[in-house]
């Protein structure tokens, strides 16, 4: 970078915006990022920005230079060492020499960040204001930016104490003077020549006011009449003449309304309320007429007004709930803005208000208010149903259709809010009236479908004791005119009310018949698939929620499934099997085995028939066999043992479980499917479910399953075998929950050791440069290790031949894996191990009140002392490279616990950690002494005072700063 020329930067910028190859663009981008981090960037950017450019021929170059300076001030001030005063002067000079808005904004951000970080600069804001006074437009821009920058400690390298102290020093002395300056700008605006270089705009004044609004109590701000009048007058003038100023005023008033949330000054709220209502009367005079809003008013005007009323509604939700007589007109405005606007994106702005309003109104103390507002919520139900209606024509694109469908679910949440307020009967009456009207008038399917959809979304809020409206609705639905889309919608409605049906068995038969008919009436039609999907989904819920009522229907249900399964997709088959599982589970003990066997026999016959085809074409047929195995998995969804333990009685389904395992073992071992990863994965999934559901009742098949899992994993290395092995550990290692003999528990420990040894042998053969290719196997291994730590903590910690290799694998993998599930699994496993180094056990267990000293010594010696330095290094590297933000808490937890144990082992003296911190920083590189010392100070002080939050926050702040400074892209 030493011989860099300005022309090199121009060439790179041109390349990025040209038609050059992506490879060339990436190289240009990399070059520019290297430049932005270099020391020479300071002087070159100054050189670029110092050149006159009257025709804006070099605008892109100048913007890049200004952005680079902003980033340099943010991250690289340490490069300037003792030259900060000279840079400050040059930055102010550059600021006054430019008139392009984008450049001025970037330089002002740089100036604000410099003022915050350059602690030796005394009274910086007064100096800046004095210098920029002759250029009010630039000064306004700076003053707008300054408070925004004081919100973000992440854009500085300061400690929290330094940052907060500096902010008070910069903001507090000038806050009231800024308001006076803004008032003077109003006069200047009225008298200035719009073409002068120092001219200011109404938008600038309002944007600046918006930034500073947070610095004052709302009561104080509202006393500055010239500014408040300006806000309301600008909005009152509408958005036709000055759209930017209108938007700025809307933003400003939204802040004021938001800040009024906590005020107890009723006069203030009353005054704002009246001003809002005056704005509505002025700008939306026909809001309450039948005229369509979007035909009469500009979309941006409607959006702005919606934002204002929503902001007020959310801020005053409690007082609105208390005073319906006073605030009802405002709620009516929100009702109209919700129901009459065709722009559904803007309509959605109102949804949080309705939710929060509902939260208040359902409280007992607002019972009278709820009655007063009920008519509004009834109208809201009807307005939402209208919005739910599909358009009569086609959507312009698939994207538009998907967006509308997603939006319907959000609108459904509002209907739930309405139902909670007006009550079950009143809420149900609204779609019922519309359905009856649609039938009488023979309306299009769109008009019928919308109220049906609304019924679907209301279901969770409907009382299970409702006995008047819902029976009528159910009967009407089951006799609706036949139309595919109506059939689809009505079937889904029935599926949502199955809990209600369980309390009203007299309506079960008619609903089941309606659903069964749906499979037959539309067979062969283009809509058949969607109807089958809806019917299967509904039947699943009927079987689940009405399982006891359906005990006598089991033969009919099974025959129905066997008849239709060949004509329905696998997802629908799966859902039906899930539903059947619930009904089977409620069968009498004497019958359950025979009934279950009927479905099992059919399934296994189909698998057996597929085996010869699979042998001929495994790639094509393996998924089909796997799907059939998945149906067995679904059949175990609701099945449970009849007794808690085998000593209480024999399990009637155990012979069926043994039968299933024998058939699957034949497929896997005799037919050779144990080397087919797709089939093995589904079998592992099924076995896990069987063991989780029937736990110790499965002991008769345990030896055979364990032998198969050992042999299968040894032969193939498939992670599924490890994943399934974990379920054996969870069941037969848990001697507190189940009657497990010591010999059986020990046998499962030896089984687990064998699986771990096989993984470690396999891992040593992995290509370490391609670890991401093995992430699934790594997840399965560390999931198994987590199970071992949970149920065999002592055996695991004292097994040095296992503990050491596990740590080595973890440290080699954790920051090299891109897969989130993989590295988070390792992090949590490491955390589990380290947590046993404290006196209090990390799990709730009857048998261990205090962690044995022998276990703790193992953690101290074999984990912290032997691997701790490397552990925190790899975790720090992961924190600044591969780990997503959501994994940071887990990684930092491991680091802090490791340092805590090290400190405790050193007679509670945390200075021993300094050397580790310094080594980490040295390995990371590109860390200033100040940044290093701030990290070490936060860690040591926090550990010594047992303020572990301080340690975590110190590490988090360092990681965030390091990533932004050295890792994240600076190029915009």
From Swiss-Prot:
SMART domains: IBN_N
Major site of localization recorded for this protein: nucleus
Organism domain of life: Eukaryota
Keywords assigned: Nucleus
Entries under Gene3D superfamilies matching the protein: Leucine-rich Repeat Variant (1.25.10.10)
GO molecular function: nuclear localization sequence binding; small GTPase binding
GO cellular component terms given for this protein: cytoplasm; nuclear periphery; nucleus
Protein's cellular compartments: Nucleus
GO biological process, one term: RNA localization
InterPro entries from the UniProt entry: ARM-like, ARM-type_fold, Exportin-1/Importin-b-like, Importin-beta_N, Importin_beta-like_NTR
Functional summary from the UniProt entry: Involved in mRNA transport from nucleus to cytoplasm.
Note: Present with 6340 molecules/cell in log phase SD medium.
The protein's name in its UniProt record: mRNA transport regulator MTR10
Organism of this sequence: Saccharomyces cerevisiae (strain ATCC 204508 / S288c) (Baker's yeast)
Organism ancestry: Eukaryota, Fungi, Dikarya, Ascomycota, Saccharomycotina
Gene responsible for this protein: MTR10
């Amino acid at each position: 970078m030493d011989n860099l020329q300005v022309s090199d930067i121009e060439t790179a910028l041109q390349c990025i915006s040209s038609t050059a190859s992506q490879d060339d663009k990436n190289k240009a981008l990399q070059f520019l990022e290297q430049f932005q981090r270099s020391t020479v960037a300071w002087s070159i950017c100054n050189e670029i920005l110092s050149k006159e450019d009257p025709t804006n021929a070099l605008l892109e170059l100048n913007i890049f230079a200004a952005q680079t300076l902003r980033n340099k001030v943010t991250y690289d001030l340490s490069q300037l060492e003792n030259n900060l005063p000279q840079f400050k002067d040059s930055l102010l000079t550059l600021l006054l020499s430019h008139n392009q808005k984008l450049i001025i904004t970037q330089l002002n951000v740089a100036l604000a960040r410099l003022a915050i970080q350059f602690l030796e600069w005394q009274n910086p804001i007064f100096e800046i204001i004095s210098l920029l006074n002759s250029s009010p437009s630039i000064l306004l821009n700076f003053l707008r930016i300054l408070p925004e920058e004081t919100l973000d400690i992440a854009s500085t390298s300061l400690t929290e104490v330094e940052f907060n102290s500096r902010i008070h020093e910069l903001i507090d002395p000038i806050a009231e003077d800024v308001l006076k300056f803004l008032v003077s700008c109003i006069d200047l605006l009225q008298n200035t020549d719009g073409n002068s270089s120092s001219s200011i705009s109404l938008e600038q004044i309002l944007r600046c006011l918006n930034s500073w609004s947070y610095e004052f109590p709302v009561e104080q701000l509202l006393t500055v009449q010239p500014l408040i009048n300006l806000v309301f007058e600008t909005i009152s003038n509408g958005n036709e003449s000055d759209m930017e100023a209108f938007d700025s005023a809307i933003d400003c008033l939204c802040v004021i309304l938001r800040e009024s949330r906590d005020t107890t000054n009723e006069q203030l709220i009353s005054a704002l309320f009246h001003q809002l209502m005056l704005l509505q009367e002025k700008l939306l005079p026909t809001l309450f007429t039948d005229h369509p809003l979007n035909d009469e008013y500009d979309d941006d005007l409607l959006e702005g007004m919606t934002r204002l009323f929503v902001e007020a509604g959310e801020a005053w939700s409690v007082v609105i709930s208390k005073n319906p007589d006073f605030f009802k007109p405002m709620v009516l405005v929100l009702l109209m803005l919700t129901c009459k606007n065709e722009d559904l994106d803007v309509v959605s702005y109102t949804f949080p208000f309705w939710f929060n309003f509902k939260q208040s109104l359902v409280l007992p103390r607002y019972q009278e208010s709820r009655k007063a507002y009920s008519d509004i919520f009834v109208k809201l139900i009807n307005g939402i149903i209208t919005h739910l209606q599909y358009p009569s024509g086609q959507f312009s694109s698939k994207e538009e259709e998907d967006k509308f469908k997603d939006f319907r679910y959000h609108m459904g949440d509002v209907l739930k809010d309405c139902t909670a307020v007006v009550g079950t009967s009143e809420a149900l009456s609204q779609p019922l009236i519309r359905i009856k009207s649609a039938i009488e008038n023979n309306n299009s399917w769109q008009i019928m479908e919308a109220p049906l959809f609304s019924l679907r979304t209301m279901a969770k809020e409907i009382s299970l004791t409702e006995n008047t409206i819902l029976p009528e609705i159910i009967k009407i639905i089951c006799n609706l005119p036949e139309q595919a889309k109506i059939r689809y919608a009505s079937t889904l409605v029935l599926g949502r009310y199955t809990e209600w049906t369980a309390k009203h068995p007299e309506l079960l038969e008619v609903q089941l018949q309606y659903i069964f008919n749906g499979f037959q009436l539309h067979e062969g039609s283009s809509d058949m698939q969607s109807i089958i999907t809806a019917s299967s989904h509904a039947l699943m819920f009927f079987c689940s929620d009405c399982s006891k009522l359906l005990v006598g229907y089991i033969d009919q249900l099974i025959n129905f499934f066997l008849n239709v399964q060949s004509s329905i997709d696998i997802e629908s088959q799966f859902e039906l099997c899930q539903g059947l599982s619930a009904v089977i589970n409620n069968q009498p003990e004497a019958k359950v085995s025979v009934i279950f066997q009927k479905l099992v026999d059919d399934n296994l016959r189909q698998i057996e028939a597929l085996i010869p085809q699979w042998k001929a074409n495994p790639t094509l047929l393996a998924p089909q066999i796997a799907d059939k195995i998945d149906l067995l998995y679904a059949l175990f969804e609701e099945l449970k043992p009849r007794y808690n333990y085998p000593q209480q009685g024999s399990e009637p389904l155990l012979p069926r479980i043994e039968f299933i395992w024998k058939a699957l073992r034949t497929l896997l071992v005799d037919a050779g499917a144990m080397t087919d990863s797709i089939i093995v994965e589904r079998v592992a999934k099924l076995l896990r479910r069987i063991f989780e559901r029937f736990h110790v009742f499965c002991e008769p098949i345990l030896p055979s399953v364990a032998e198969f899992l050992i042999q299968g994993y040894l032969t193939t290395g498939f992670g599924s075998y490890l994943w399934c092995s974990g379920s054996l550990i969870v069941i037969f290692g848990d001697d507190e929950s189940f009657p497990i003999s010591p010999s059986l528990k020990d046998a499962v420990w030896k089984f687990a050791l064998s699986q771990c040894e096989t993984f470690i042998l396999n891992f040593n053969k992995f290509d370490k440069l391609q670890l991401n290719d093995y992430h699934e196997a790594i997840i399965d291994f560390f999931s198994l290790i987590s199970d071992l730590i949970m149920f065999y903590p002592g055996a695991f910690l004292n097994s040095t031949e296992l503990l050491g290799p596990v740590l080595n694998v973890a440290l080699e993998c954790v920051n090299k894996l891109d897969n989130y599930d993989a590295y988070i699994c390792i992090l949590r496993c490491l955390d589990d191990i380290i947590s046993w180094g404290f006196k209090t056990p990390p799990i709730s267990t009857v048998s261990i009140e205090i962690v044995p000293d022998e276990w703790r010594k193992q953690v101290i010696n074999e984990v912290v002392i032997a691997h701790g330095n490397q552990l925190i290094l790899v975790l720090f590297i992961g924190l600044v490279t591969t780990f997503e933000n959501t994994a940071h808490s887990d990684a930092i937890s491991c680091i802090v616990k490791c340092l805590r144990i090290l400190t405790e082992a050193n007679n509670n003296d945390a200075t021993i950690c300094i050397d580790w911190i310094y080594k980490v920083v040295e390995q990371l590189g590109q860390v200033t002494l100040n940044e290093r010392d701030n990290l070490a100070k936060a860690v040591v002080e926090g550990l010594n005072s047992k303020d572990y939050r301080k340690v975590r926050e110190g590490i988090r702040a360092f990681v965030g700063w390091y990533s932004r400074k050295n890792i994240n892209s600076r190029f915009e």
